[in-house]
Amino acid sequence: VDEVIRLGDRMVVLREGGVFAAGGVTELLERLDLAEATGRFEAGTVLSGEIVGHDETFKTSRVSVGEQVLDMPRAPMAVGTGVRLRVRARDVALATTRPSGISIRNILGARVIQIVEEPDTAFAEVLVDIGAQRLRARITRAAVADLGLAEGGAVFALVKSVAFDRRVLGDDSAATRT
């Protein structure tokens, strides 16, 4: 999946010898019904953004994604550069109130679009709208119940900085880790 994101804008999913789905990479990665094809553990979304600043003290970059801003490990790109960021569903947590006193720096206001529970596992995939774009979160079914999550509900998406992969930014070195 990482190679598809880095190299292409369009993707085709084949099933039983035929085209099952085709479209933009971002669009197909957001589809919860394609989890088996896109990989549950590596499932995620691609966000389009723009570098809006750098913090040399902490070696971070700020990326605007619509009206919201994400902090990520320093990207070797100039302010104003457009970027695509891969955010894995397993690196997104959800909260119904804005958390404080935590190490996760990226807390985005969001609205639940879709919840798909995996009946034979402990997990659920939740698709949330963060404004102009969407994120996937892979959380437990128990968390969905405990939080009272429902389509249309307001949540906060907590994105770990480790979720940003330098390879998607065009650098073939190892993935960015914090």
Residue ranges and their predicted role:
Residues L14, H54-E56, V87, E117, ...:
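Generic beta-strand structural signal
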Residues V69-V116, R134, R138-T178:
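Glycine/charge-rich catalytic "coupling/switch" loops of P-loop NTPases
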Residues E125-L135:
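Short beta-strand-turn/beta-hairpin segments enriched in glycine/proline and small hydrophobics
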Residues V1-Q68:
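Internal alpha/beta loop-helix hairpins
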